Structure formats: C-alpha cells, structure tokens
Amino acid sequence: KVVHLHGGELTLGAYDDAYRHSITKFSYLHFTASKNYRRRVIQLGENPRKVFNVGPLARESISHVKFLKKSELEKRLKLKLKQNLILATFHPEIGSEEKNKQNLMNFIHVLGELENVSVLFTSPNLDFLGNEVKKLLKEKIKDFENIAYFESLGFELYYSLMRFTKCVVGNSSSGIIEAPIMGVSSINIGKRQEGRDQEKTTVNSSFNKSELKNKIEKVLQQKKQSKKNIKNVSK
C-alpha cells in the first residue's frame, strides 16, 4: 500500500501536477499540507476517511534543525553576510528556452544592482531546461560582486541562513512553504508556483525588472515577520 505526502497541490508553471495527481490515484492513504489540498484529493475521487490534513512536512524538518550562528555560517560559506541578505532560486518554467533565459537575466540584473545587499543563489532543479539554466546562472553572476552561488546548501545551512535572511526571492516552493514557517518574507516570481496556497508574507511579482526591483526594495524595508502573526494555511 502507498502513502502519499503533499498530494492535491498545484504548480501550474511546472510539469509536477501530472505526476502528483497520478501518485494520488494509486495511493491508499493521503497526508496533505492544507485544507484546500485535502479537498482536491477528495475531488479526485479518494475516500475522505483516508485523507488527512497534517500541514507541510517542512515544519517537522525545521523543528529538528540545529541552527548555526552567523559567525559559523560565514566561516562555513567563506563569505561575509550583510544585514540585508537575500536567498534566491530560479527554476525553469514551462515554456521556451529563450523565455526562461530572459527571465533569469532580468532576475540576476535586478539582484546584482541592489545596494548593500548580499545574495545567495542556490542551484535550479535539474528537470526541464535545468542544466541550461544552471550554466547561464553561473556565468552571468560573475558580473556582480554581491551575488554568490552554491550548488547545494543542505537543510542545516539553508534553514540557518534563512534565520538571518530579509527575503527569499524566486520561484521555488521554499519561499511559499518554508519561509513563512521561519517568519521570513518572500517574493514569488512568475507562474511556476501558481496554484499553491500562500501566506500573507508572500508577495507575487512578474519577471519585469522595474516591478521586481520595486517589490524587493519594499520588502527589504519591512521588519521581519513575527511567526505568531502568520496565518497557517494548513488549518
């Protein structure tokens, strides 16, 4: 028998939905991340008595992390973290290679032109156009001193960094799921994550450079969110 975690979710800008819903159909038990996702699994024909809303798994992962101090992070990463720190990720969206390249270029230029800001870019998924995007990303960030690239940070480093982050920016589910749990604001760009439930700490933007720059600057001026003030979409 198969147990399915995080079923019922939508990501309209990626190919995940077809696989996710297929797994739902041959699973026996379902543990979803929100009430809306539970409803969707039931709409797909699953027995409501076997569908449970338990919230995102990331909450459990974060609760077991031994967070590193800022000094330890700087030592491990071999760089100085500014007060305004941004965690950034770009995954390819469904569409043409040229469109994805242009979106990434806009994203990099906006981040690179921010003043008094450190940007840590993590690697894109190696799915649709992933290798092409990673190659372009690693090449273009060389033009900007405030941007550093890390292939993989792992849970401990990533979540520890998030404690000192002013904003998570990009089109990764991390900005929609993990960032609110940590009390961190996020900017979700483009359509890759379109369809997911969002907290009030998430701001949406296109890849238009002026719009994106304006929204990042506004978020950087805000105080860090209090976890107790964040609406829990799992309820």
Task: Name these PLM-found stretches.
Residues G7-L10, K35, P124-N125, K191-R192:
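Short, ordered loop/turn segments at secondary-structure junctions
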